[in-house]
Amino acid sequence: CLEKGVSTIFFSATLLPVQYYKEVLSGNQEEYAVYVPSPFDASRRLLAVGRDVSSRYKRRNSREYWKILNYILTAARARKGNYLVYFPSYAYMNEVYSLYQTMGEQQDVEIAVQSGNMKEDDREAFLEKFREKRERSLAAFCVMGGIFSEGIDLKGEQLIGGLVVGTGLA
């Protein structure tokens, strides 16, 4: 299908390694590629992995959901701020959120949840939560690949962390 155009531009922050994708997408190693360094200081990045949990279908049960919720709350309590939490599906996200609701009001962590039928006003209201001054942490539950996975701009302290539940590796 690429032959029909005069040129094609692939734009992504995730197409690494570039040489591999140049071969797969165009077959021509001579294609032009631009490498842009990350604007984020790598020394300020923390990567933590919960090895005792899994998002595999056969392990999806309330015990796993409780462990995942505990990880989310622990992260959000460690430093007050706004966090995005990505889940592999709405069903998985809603299971974890249902458990949170049974705990009663958490004094130090507020949860916001993406719904599957958000209109533009709903999306704006969801993102506005990150701009509000708040007394407690916000953990915003979203779905991987959904409307809040790309193309949002949360600057400075509007977003201080991200958590991914189920990377497909465990």
Predicted segments, located by residue:
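ASCE RecA-like P-loop NTPase motor cores
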Residues: 1-170
